[in-house]
Amino acid sequence: MAVSARSARTSPGSDKVQKDKAELISGPRQDSLMGKLLGFEWTDLSSWRRLVTLLNRPTDPASLAVFRFLFGFLMVLDIPQERGLSSLDRKYLDGLDVCRFPLLDALRPLPLDWMYLVYTIMFLGALGMMLGLCYRISCVLFLLPYWYVFLLDKTSWNNHSYLYGLLAFQLTFMDANHYWSVDGLLNARRRNAHVPLWNYAVLRGQIFIVYFIAGVKKLDADWVEGYSMEYLSRHWLFSPFKLLLSEELTSLLVVHWGGLLLDLSAGFLLFFDASRSIGLFFVSYFHCMNSQLFSIGMFSYVMLASSPLFCSPEWPRKLVSYCPQRLQELLPLKAAPQPSVSCVYKRSRGKSGQKPGLRHQLGAAFTLLYLLEQLFLPYSHFLTQGYNNWTNGLYGYSWDMMVHSRSHQHVKITYRDGRTGELGYLNPGVFTQSRRWKDHADMLKQYATCLSRLLPKYNVTEPQIYFDIWVSINDRFQQRIFDPRVDIVQAAWSPFQRTSWVQPLLMDLSPWRAKLQEIKSSLDNHTEVVFIADFPGLHLENFVSEDLGNTSIQLLQGEVTVELVAEQKNQTLREGEKMQLPAGEYHKVYTTSPSPSCYMYVYVNTTELALEQDLAYLQELKEKVENGSETGPLPPELQPLLEGEVKGGPEPTPLVQTFLRRQQRLQEIERRRNTPFHERFFRFLLRKLYVFRRSFLMTCISLRNLILGRPSLEQLAQEVTYANLRPFEQVGELSPSNMDSSHSNPPESNPDPVHSEF
């Protein structure tokens, strides 16, 4: 860019002439109140031609180009990380029996080496977008692979990944290469040329919609009452607020109400000149916090990069003017921009104004239609009813960020052989690489269909698949989300019709949450509780582990019958009644009332409690020996308590070994907690370096395979082993390359129903 900067350097007087000329061709200054507030007059909206002229008004390209550069740079960083280039071989390894969840069943991943080629094209597109090199082609090279990878896996969908695709789509049609770009160096007509106002209008409108719709979604009662992110206030980032407020008030006032007000107001604060500095401060603080609170990749930084779009478009030129003269030679141009055919210029000093052409009208139409579509999509749930579960709409484009938190207590997958009638049970998540299928009917249907294709390999013919999934959303009762009596393989599902086998969320029981919190707070530290709600006519089969020596069930509402399977005994419970449950046995809880039943399991993990007491005794004994209050010699099997490790002699007891492992773990946690900042930062850089190193090496291996053919398996194994090395990290660091993420285990056929335990 330095060549472009030097070639346009002019004297201060010449800069002033160019600026005056640009002001003349852009039209008169807006002196009315509306013009000062919004940047346009009512007359600009009085006809289609005037609106087209407004949206194609010549605008400084500087701010748009800076956003293009930052967005492209962040996508370059995103592709090896959240897009998964560094772990692509574990996700798309050829020959894996894996159930996948594309938007359309016809979408299939390419062979592994070709998937690396797809990611390479996407990476080069992001790099070209950042540099402004063959800009339009680079945008397309990034955009097409990005949406292909995005649509290939619904389990990875989220709001910010969807937003990246939208921003790349918008940039494809914009003139973001008219400033600080390689294209500008090579083409004098593009270099430092105006861009039409609609380029900024679309981007600003998109960011405004993200903030505002997210705020509207947070008007949900669960968010306003503080149930959505109840535990977030425990994070150390909220410690300053807890100097004045309790943890509960910090959660309600700061996390929930503060987040609601910020989302509703951020777009307005950024839009108006008078409030922009306040808006920039709060959204910057907000996104910096989010980058530490959540694993959301580049989202916080993309939003930070988008904030300056609301500032005056020429702000980069003003920033450059404050830099030393020598440094300015390496920075973007500060000269006034030149005219562009993409813009419509008004009358200036006796000259007639320019008539808008087809390209100008298409730009204006694109702006209006795109923003209207973005306002409509978050509320289009009545069209895509098949994707409506307890929350409405396709996940990822509704901007309902962090409004719903879920916990899964119990997941059981039952298969029945269609010919023999034999029952069996599958490990939850077998043949998948994600856990997200548990909450969405469309993915559950895809999972069941996939299992019906795979199970015949394990001598299960014409399999029927049943799911019993218990979920709590925003601290409600645990309840079934799908009907466990329905064979999902044969169940009907359509994207445009309501799914009949989705159980309704028991909203009538929401007021119970305050009472449930009271019950939790009244229990001691060793007592746990699980709250259950079930539908009439259904039953829960459960197993009480032998570790849970003191387990009881108490009815809160409705009526249930508890069957003790081994004892062949039934007992009916009514509101307020409870009974003890034997450990190591199965029981069934039938809802016999005409309305949903509510009950709770109260239990103590007696094995864990005894272990904690024994470990506390060993810790106390160790401290007594160290401070001299314990004068008697320790038995040989307890000597490792003082030495911190086993150094020969009698084999320590399992309890002592557990104590030593616990001490080592606590020491490691303390060491990491007290690590200086520069060491933490260095370790962070090493982890990122490994991600990029592995991405590069595995990509080179795959591209070599495509060009020259695959070598022997022994050579491939050596190359992959080398790619997995962490030469920059200390020995003992956990390598994700050694972690198996496929979970492609065969089903467990077991005549005895072994389920997940509460």
UniProtKB/Swiss-Prot annotation:
Residues 82-113, 158-292, 383-758 are lumenal. Its main location: endoplasmic reticulum. Residues 2-60, 135-136, 314-361 are cytoplasmic. The modification N-acetylalanine is found at A2. It catalyses: 4-carboxy-L-glutamyl-[protein] + 2,3-epoxyphylloquinone + H2O + H(+) = phylloquinol + L-glutamyl-[protein] + CO2 + O2. It is a multi-pass membrane protein. The keyword Chloroplast does not apply. It comes from the Eukaryota. One of its GO terms (cellular component) is endoplasmic reticulum membrane. Mediates the vitamin K-dependent carboxylation of glutamate residues to calcium-binding gamma-carboxyglutamate (Gla) residues with the concomitant conversion of the reduced hydroquinone form of vitamin K to vitamin K epoxide. Catalyzes gamma-carboxylation of various proteins, such as blood coagulation factors (F2, F7, F9 and F10), osteocalcin (BGLAP) or matrix Gla protein (MGP). Belongs to the vitamin K-dependent gamma-carboxylase family. The vitamin K-dependent protein substrates of carboxylase have usually a propeptide that binds to a high-affinity site on the carboxylase. CO(2), O(2) and reduced vitamin K are cosubstrates. This is Vitamin K-dependent gamma-carboxylase.
